[in-house]
């Protein structure tokens, strides 16, 4: 375990009641402050269970989960952990609790007992950061799915978290909604140093992470940078997972004899490397 880790999982196992086998089995990982970690896995792999363990919604059957220095096994620290590690769920409608946007953002602060005079600027700042200020007095049901998720992010941001856990937060959104939510969380990660645990089944989202964990049958099977993980094309297929489109295309072109390097994730990567192969004199200048 890294001594400076923001989130640490130490030989963590978790078994649901009456389940024949553990959902997670002896998982160990360390997430550093400011890292953006993507977690991939097929349905039932254990990735959502991992999210709930980090947020102290679940307590491990074995092992320890430590968030910002707090062990989730200590019941007295649960609310402190949840203040520091905010969670965005899959369905935005399931986390809207008020009839006005600014009141929804205030909900978590009220539970923390934050004084009104401190609450108001924190709400305004949070909505400003996620670009939702003009909807402050709107009814949440009038918003798009992406806008609702940004309101949920504002509610977390107002509590000044160290960690954001997104449990398939873009799964129910259209492409434009997915883009705006990912861009918002990535911006918070880069400008405020908030650590992000981004659970997704969209490979292009995972390709933007600093590091990727791939979970299958409750165990971490692959770990590394997006380029390192997605270069295991055949192993990913064996785990019933895709890779980014450009990574898959590069793999097919290599099989046809084109000498492309590994680590191709985006259209820009592909264009650059194909140009090097087809026009070596041009790429050298």
Explain the meaning of each model-derived region.
Residues 63-73, 81:
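Conserved ABC transporter NBD signature motif
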Residues 55:
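Helix-to-loop junction immediately C-terminal to a conserved catalytic motif
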